[in-house]
Amino acid sequence: MHRSTNRILTTHVGSLIRPDSIRRHLRAKQKGEGYDAAAHAACLAQEVAAVVRKQAEVGVDVVSDGEFGKGISWSQYVIERVAGFERRPFDPKTGNPFTRGADRTRFPEFYAELDARDHVETITDTVAVAPIRYTGQALLQRDIDNFKAALRGVKVVEGFLPVAAPASVIPDRKNVYYRNEEELAEAIGQAMNVEYKQIVDNGFLVQLDDARAAVTYDRMVPPASFQDYRKRVRLYQDVVNRATQGIPTEKIRYHVCWGSWPGPHTTDVPIKDIVDLILRVRAGAYVLEMANPRHEHEWQVWRDVKLPKGAVLIPGVISHATNVVEHPELVKERIVRLAKLVGRENVIAGTDCGFAQQPFYQRVHPTIQWAKLQALVEGARLASKELWGRGGKAGRSAAKKASAKKRPAKKTAARKRPAKAAKKRRAA
């Protein structure tokens, strides 16, 4: 994993807005009408190449494939790659998992309106009915091969692929096979180890997306206690560490956010209450939501908390959930204040969460997505200038061209200084 050794590097959380061409194939596949697998595969390879090229053009350093290969959401995609789960008709007796939570209890009118607008409706449960085992090697290799091909001919620092952490695999899953949730989580972790290792073995960083680490608080407390919640998260993170056995620490990014949905989030657990649990996960980088108005103030926790030795902090300095584009100066401020606490070389600038948690959903307009990433890159350039006393070795992008144009003038000025000094001595 590269570090910000001479400038602030940039990245994002992974998912990017899918183009209509991919969505058309997915709609046909879901409906079972006129689906052409070969055409879909060709389209996917073409669009992954385009989105990687666009990230490079904007100036993002550590890029992803946009999660374009996932036909369902960031967490539900696993049902296409793991055996042992079954879709069953939704059982209203057990309650709709998407209508639970303290925030929803506090703002029922708001959430009723939001659900109606977003057409939120649960029609199936996902149930563990047999031994969980990984079967998605071919699908994953397709995504890996597309990403490798897309990276040829573009200049970026590194590539990563985001996947679901064990606790976030099919959230609110049901279980009729294993004795308890602990056994099911362990089985999922062992199955997902195959996916994690396959990504790293092909030369990429693996990012484990774990929204459930924080969201579980909103779902559990009340009626459960805070200690009950911490016990559950600790269990899940032990599963994460076992699921990444055999993978070098520096190849792992661990992402935690507070669920990403566009709600009040007044019942989110404060990071100060779980940062110790987050850092229990063995990872080379911790990718955290830190730019939204509910959590931005929490940068101050890093006054007292130390990163594990060798680890990197990837703070969200750009929000994914608003069409307001952050000013690069604000992005710079967010980066600099953290860099002064944890060390400039230990910060890579990122986004709060993905821009499209599933193929048919997007948090902002596509043009705004790219404008935000441009603001991220420019803010990182400004932060590099302040932290290193110069523009930083920007390497790519317009920042490099601008600095190249300025160099001759600086050298000329430097050559003139001795001459001026000599004139002063003669005058004396």
Regions of interest found by a model, annotated:
Residues 1-428:
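Domain-level signal for soluble alpha/beta catalytic cores
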